[in-house]
Every structure is written in C-alpha cells, then in structure tokens.
Amino acid sequence: MLTLLATLLTACGGGGSGNSDSSSTTSPTPIPTSTTNSTVELAAMKLLNENRSQCGFGSLTANQNLNLTAMNHASYMASVTETNKQPFASHEERVETGLLDTGITNPYYSGIDLAARLNPFTLGKNAVSTYYDYQAQGENISLSNFSTNNSSYTVNDTATVEAMLYNLFAAPYHLRSLVYPQFTEVGLSYQLVKWTANNEINHTSLLEIVSALPSSQKYIENTKLLNFPCDGVTTGYELTDETPNPFGTTRDLKYQPIGQPIYVLAPFDKTIAEATATITQNGTSIGMIHTLTSLSDPNKLLSKNEVIFIPDLPLKPNTGYQVSYQLVYNDGQKTTNQFTFKTRP
C-alpha cells in the first residue's frame, strides 16, 4: 500500500484597508462537499476561537456573508483541483498558465482577490452572491493532499481540518493573521476533492478562512502585550512550508523545517528595539532561535510592535515547553513574559 501526505500553506493576508484598490477534456465541476456551518467547519471555528480567546486575542463571530465568500473561493480551488487532477490553492482567481478552468471562466469565479470577492461584481454560474463592507480583512488557506492506492480509504474530515489549522498556527505569517486582534468576524469553508491520477487515489482537503473587521464596528487599537502560544495552549511542532517564506530565499523549509513560532504583539504605540527569547524543555535549551522583527522581516509584513521568535529546529511532538522572552522598546522600557505550552501528538 502506498500513501503520501502533503500540505501547503499559501500566502496569508494581514489587515487590509477598505479603501484599497482590488484590482483537453475537463472533469465535471465538483459539488461542494460541505455546507456553511457544517460539523467540520464548526470544529475549525471552535479550535480557532479557543486559541484566540485563551491567549487574549478575542474570539470571532461567524458571519454568513464571510462564510459565502469563503465557500465561493474554496469551491473555486476545488474545481481547479479536480479539473486538472492536481492540488491547487491560490489567493487569486486569475488565469493560470498550463491550468484549465482558471480565471473568470470557472463556474465558481467570484473575484480576482479577496477584496473583490467580498463584494463580487462578476459571478460564475455556480458562485453565490454576497456582500461585506469591511475596514480590515485577511485570508488564510491550507491545503492537504493524501495519496493512496487503497480504494477503501476515507478521510476523517474533522481530524484533517483541525490538523490543517494547527499547521496554520505553526506558520509565522499565518499565525499573525489568524490571531489579529482587530478582526471580530470570520467565515470558513472546508472542501474535499477526490480524484485519481497515475493509478493513485488523491484526497485533497482545502480550508479557506476569511477574517475581517466590519465597517460598522469601531477599530480599537491593541493596548496589551499579547503572545501566541500562551499558557496552556496546545500547538503544532514543526513547519515544512509557508508562502511567503519567513526566511526569504535563504532557507527551504521542506528540507530545513522549523519549530512552532512564538508570536508577540506589543501595544500599538510601542516600537520594539530589542527582543530576546529562550525556549526550554525540562530546563534544557532547544537551541538557536531566529528573531523576526519589522527590520529583519524579508517580506516586510511585520509592524514595529511585532516580533516572531522561530526555533531553528522542529520541536518534539506531545512535549511541554517553557518560554521566556524580553522586549526593550525604543523609549527604554523593558517588559518580560514567561509561559508554558505543549505540542500536539
């Protein structure tokens, strides 16, 4: 029996302004395998909110229009996956060279990017109409593909979507977007596509998460020192892929995976001048930790009050860790925090 599991995390959007510009034979179009607020999506919502709330970032409220936005795009990616017999995930719904049924001709097309999909002008025949007026928005996508020659294999959707969410939390930029404290509402969609190629049966799972702050709510700046993980949280233990790569072109995460990152958000009016951290397991240091700040971030996504500590090596599964970090702000003020967390089996 041959089995293969692959995961992919696509580039995540951070906060976005509501004023920004947004600018052969095919297989049958797939029918979405789950509906909004299905058991699987509710499990993902529960896990997301438990982690946000426990670490002080606040829980999110489900929004039906965001659910529809997420469902449209998840269905688009599922359609492209099935038509081309290869896993596909992207933040954009544009024509892709070498792929069939991409762009505006796809029956689930709803907009070139997330900003357009929140208020779609052009819809494919199977896409649904939706509208969401936002101040800030973000998008996280996770893809998991399982290949096997076992025709009786079935996917445990709930376990799969939870593992996909843990993978997102283990990715520095995706983690940052998932816990963004100004987001108050969320929409999710999970799709499963089954297809066969080269005598292998593939099960492609797609998770689309759209988070936002509606225009009707006041934007409240963060005034706390927050971090994820935090006391009592269970996380992933390694990361083998993220786009964009937090190391730029200097490291291939597939061959040099990293451990669960530590994301720290200082109050909005603070600028982090120095940041140090130690991570130990039963008193023994785990080794090198990379420090990502607004100055060292190769993708220029972090703000002046953010830092991400990244273990150089994967952590151990089902293991407890102790974290201690210190920040020095540009006004000379120092702050520290300590907490423990555990990795999942």
Feature-to-residue mapping (PLM):
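Sec-dependent signal peptide recognition
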Residues: 1-3
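C-terminal motif of bacterial Sec signal peptides marking the signal peptidase cleavage site
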Residues: 8-11
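Functional surface patches built around histidine and acidic residues
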Residues: 15-281, 302, 306, 322-325
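Extended, polar beta-sheet/loop recognition surfaces of beta-rich domains
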Residues: 263, 268-270, 317, 328-345
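Short proline/glycine- and polar residue-rich coil/turn motifs
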Residues: 297-303, 316, 331-333
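Surface-exposed, short loops/turns at beta-strand junctions within beta-sandwich domains
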Residues: 312-319
